Amino acid sequence: MKGNPSTHEVIGTMSTRRFYRWLITIDGDTEINYRNYEELPSRSNYIFFFGGRLRAVKTARPFSLVVLFLILSPMVLFSVFEAHRLWHTRYGYKALVVLFYYAWAWSLLSFTKTATSDPGVLPRNIHMHKDTPQEYFNNVTLPYGAGGSAGNASVTLKYCHTCKIWRPPRASHCSVCECCVLTHDHHCIWVNNCVGQRNYRYFLAFLLSSTLACALLIANCALHLHRALHEGIRVSHRPLPVAVLLCVYAAVLCVYPVILLGYHVAMSGTQQTTREYLRSIGFRNPVMHRIRRRRDNPYAEHGFLRNMLDLMAEPRGPRSCNYRYR
């Protein structure tokens, strides 16, 4: 018959559990009086990593891992088959190689920041009674006194019956993340996170850097092909097929980021988020509609360029939910 576990065994087991909970926290526990990231998974749809430093959304379709693979795979192929030859060529293409690696690293960092950072999550009201007062079902309309081009425009405050809070203007509730987000633009399945006030700039940087990385990859491989063909090397010889593959890969892959980047530049120039734009056109197909400046938009106070800078460079603001606090 086995005896009771010793004190050292109990301490070792508890330390192991704490380490795994620090490494990845999937299911929270409201009874644990430790840090917020150990409790929040039970109230939201988040998974926390490394003691609440990184976070992701629970999903059965991890498209963000596919995007991560699409980012890493061309860099590996380029490093193995192309970089060495271009670096040591007598024509001096070292600058293009360095620029590609810089754009690729920028793209990977921006993707990571977009996917794992806080988009502007608002804390829930956990002290509210389950029965919502009847007056909370009414929206509150306030005058917007900025004196902009929108004239006597107004902003609407809505009560979130899930989070039990009054949402600030431009904030919306995400049904995937199960939380309200400041200046909520949309929930992006490709980064598995919401795009909001605190990570919108990272999202735009990801689109821009991905476009630049694809363009530089095409330039590097095209120069290799051009030089090889002029020197009489057949394309069937190694490693030229890899250069052709990377050119086609980058050309196809850059289409979506270019379209999204142009779309968000137009949206930010008119001071609209994706949710506001879709609501203004009745949630119809946005491809069939031209992005126009809305006259009733209280936030479009300046010209196109100033509006774009105001939305893209909007202050991130302090984090409403610090996941590492007790």
Curated annotation (Swiss-Prot):
Superkingdom of this protein's organism: Eukaryota
UniProt keyword Membrane present: yes
Single Gene Ontology BP annotation: protein targeting to membrane
Enzyme Commission number: 2.3.1.225
Membrane-spanning segments: 63-83, 91-111, 203-223, 242-262
Keyword Transmembrane set for record: yes
Gene Ontology, cellular component aspect: endoplasmic reticulum membrane; Golgi apparatus
Pfam families to which the protein is assigned, alphabetical: DHHC
Cytoplasmic membrane side: 1-62, 112-202, 263-326
Localization annotation: Endoplasmic reticulum membrane
Function (record text): The ERF2-ERF4 complex is a palmitoyltransferase specific for Ras proteins.
Protein's recorded name: Palmitoyltransferase ERF2
Organism: Candida glabrata (strain ATCC 2001 / BCRC 20586 / JCM 3761 / NBRC 0622 / NRRL Y-65 / CBS 138)
